[in-house]
Amino acid sequence: MKECVIKSEGFYICFQLKVFESDVSYSSNTILTISVISDNFSANTDMDIDIKSFVVFVDALSSLYTTLNGTAIIQEPYGEQQYIELSADRSGHINIRGKLSSNGRGGFLQKLSFENCIDQTYLPEFIGNLSSFCSRYR
């Protein structure tokens, strides 16, 4: 999958998905690689997720953009339960928050909790790219 990116002043997030087709019937069948830079704090990590849960996330994100209401969350079902959550307010601001972690060099656990805000106009291309990728898993 190509990179799906949101880049604004002070915030960057990138998703890349690798689906293990032979494991689609299992609850963890996809690696979601996430890169985040939020006001000069950054993380790059992988989440083990279910592609079907990711489709639900993309649908919720599309609805959030259309209605400026609700939330969209993708969360690891096991382990550190890393997550990315987007929510909207009626004025068109999209709040993004998350908790990411990774075992760094030497096995030291690294964690990043972040919050940021972007304008809704950053979402259409991001949602379009994610929806295009997810179409075969509907």
What are these regions (language model features)?
Residues V58-G92:
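Short, internal acidic amphipathic alpha-helical interface segments
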Residues A43-M47, Q82, Q110-F114:
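Short beta-strand segments
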Residues N103-R138:
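Mixed-charge, glycine-accented linear interaction segment located at domain edges/termini
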Residues M1-Y26, T30-S38, A43-M47, S135-R138:
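Charged, alpha-helix-forming regions
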Residues T33-N69:
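Short, well-structured hydrophobic secondary-structure segments
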Residues F11, D39-A43, E80, G92, ...:
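Short acidic/polar mixed-charge low-complexity motifs
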Residues V24-I31, Q82-G106:
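Intrinsic, low-complexity N-terminal interaction/targeting segments
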Residues K7-E9, Q16-F20, S35-I37, D50, ...:
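A structural detector for beta-sheet-dominated domains
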